[in-house]
Structures are given as C-alpha cells and as structure tokens.
Amino acid sequence: MRTRTKRIVALLAGTAMLGSSFASFAATDVAANDLAYKGELEIMHYSTSEESEGNGGSDGFRTVLQAWDEAHPDITLTQNVLANAEYKTQIATLAAAGDLPDVFLLQGMNTKDWAKQGLLLDLTDYIKESPYYDEYDQNYFTPFKDGDSVYGYPALTGGTCTVVVYDKAMWKEAGYDTFPSTWEDVEKASEYFNEQGVTTVAFGNGGKWQANSDFLSTLGNRYTGPDWFLSLINKEGAAFTDDKFVAALTEMQHLFQDTQIFNEDFNAVTNEDAREYYISGEAAAFIGGNWDESYIWATLKENDSDKWNNMGFAVLPQPADATEAPTSQNIGLGYAIAINAKLADDPDKLAAAIDLAQEITGPAFA
C-alpha cells in the first residue's frame, strides 16, 4: 500500500458552496468501488474549512470527499482548496495554460469554450452509465452541455441561488400571514418596517456577483422565460439587449434604487454581512443562496430557538409587469464536476476520476 500524503491548500473563506444540506454527514455511504488505479488524483474546489462552519452543503461536500478518500487507500487524493473568488481566477489561468486539474468544478459559462478547446472530457456516456442516472433532473445538465454532449456532473439534488428567508412573527405583526408573492406588497410592507426601524429585506452585493446570481437570475426569468435562456446559452438569437431582459433590469433598478425595501448599504456589504442583519433581527427577511439558508438555519438553531422556529421560506416575489412563471426560482448549481480531457490517455486514472465525480455529486452528497 502506498503511503498517502495529503496536501490541502486552504486560502481564505469561500463565499458559496455546492448544494444545500443541514446535515454534516453523507446522506448515504460512499460506494467503495474496487479501482485499479494506484497513484495521485487531484481535485480543485472551493469548499474551505471556514466555509463549512455553519454551511451544511460545504460540510457535506468535504465529508463525502473524506469518505471517498478513506475508501480508496491506494489513491492519494490531493485537494487544492481555494476561496470562491480565488478559485474562479485560478481555474481560468490553468485553463488558459492547458493545465487543468484532474477533477475540478466547472462553471456553466465556461463549458462551451473549454469544450471547443478540447480541455474537457465528454462525460455523456459515462453519465448515462452512472448508477444514479435515472435520479437526475435533466434540466441540471443544460448549463454544462455543448450540443448533445455533457461535460459536467451536476449535484443529484440541486440547491437554489435565490431563496427568501423571512421571520414569520415579524411579518405577522406587519399584517402578512406569509411572505408577499408580489413586489408591490413587499413595498407596502416596507412602510411598516421602516417605521419600526427595521430593514424589510437584507441583501448584500459587496462581492459584485450576488446581484446576478442571487437575484437577477430569477427575476430575469420572470420576464424572459426558459426558452430565452436556452436560446442565449446556445447562441440562437437571444441577447441581453432584448426588450424583455431590459425590462428585468429596469425592475431591478427600481427595486433597489427607488424603493426602501433593502438596506441602504446593499452594494457595500456581502451576503455574509446581510444575513447577519436578519439573524440579529435588524431585517425582517433576507435574500440569498441555499448556502446562506443553511448557515442561517444552523446559526439560529444553536443560538436563537425562538427565531429559528419562526423561520419561513419563499420564492422571489413577482413583478407587476412580468408575465412568465411567477413561482420559478433558480434551481440547480452554478458548477458541475468536470474532468480534464487528458485523463482519457490513462484509463485506470480516468475510472477513478469518474468514480469520484459520481460519488461527490450522487446520493452520498445529496
């Protein structure tokens, strides 16, 4: 048996994580498949130890990685772990140099270009042969496809980038049994909350990605619908200059600039800061991703049982002039597990990489 050496490069705390889970353990045991490969296998991801504290999704991902590692003692699993923002920069640099890790997180927007450059292994047949294939929501594959080919394993159970977390007791006092389904009603409620010195909805865009990922991704769909999105990613005519998408931008500008719904410092604070406004009671609601949801859930469960028992969840409210799915949300993940195309030259190593990808996105993580 080869002596294993672990190299964990942890840089800063991550700002997002795959999936949502309130448990800090694998949902099912990792499949201990017999693998012929004996050697090093590298994975690059952004689930830092700091991020895993209070984030069930991040903690679960790390737990499954550790379980897979322990189940395969002849394989040295080398983890290169960076913060989310650092990860995006580093993975782009490695792609430009043609030196991607064996296994890594693929962002949907990079799929087509990197596939055309021959950097990504076509996983279509491997995914179809996966023991978990029938359990996948086929829509999760869309951002990671080029034509009919699939280049990433999405998590079996997707999270959401856009969830409203609200204090049911506070909204009850404002006259609402549930969180409003329209922005018009949210704006009306803000009059009450402002009189109480409470922020209606906390939001943080300090990282300059939250407004797009956690808000516009869902708001835009309320105006454009799913067909426009598919046309955009397939480059079949849809454009960000289309009237219906411009209408979504106009509504977003109105909500953040012309109303008093959100905290005034939304563009200066991060999602981590904004969710603390909700936790402390300074805000009656918060909008963020499933990673924020799991952090809030865990924090309140430990420190404030009353507020924890009053947690409510809702989808993004519907704008008055939007005509598409009023209850839609941004389901799925911004990343999938991808494999370096170079591994095709080493069948045993490739089999190990496929096994790893299947397990860290399958039932053990879901």
Q: Where do the language-model regions lie?
A:
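Short helix-initiation/N-cap motifs at beta->coil->alpha
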Residues: 81-90, 109, 181-188, 264-279
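Glycine-centered hinge/linker elements that transmit conformational signals in sensory
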Residues: 190, 234-266
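Short, solvent-exposed loop/beta-turn-alpha elements that line the ligand-binding surface or hinge
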Residues: 124-136, 142, 222-247, 300-306, ...
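Extracytoplasmic/periplasmic solute-binding protein
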Residues: 146-157, 162, 187-237
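Hinge/lid segment of periplasmic solute-binding proteins
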Residues: 28-32, 108-163, 187, 193, ...
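Extracytoplasmic/periplasmic substrate-recognition and gating elements
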Residues: 174, 259, 301-366
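Conserved N-terminal structural module of periplasmic/extracytoplasmic solute-binding proteins
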Residues: 3-14, 23-116, 132, 348
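A local structural motif
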Residues: 71-81, 99, 173-178, 254-269, ...
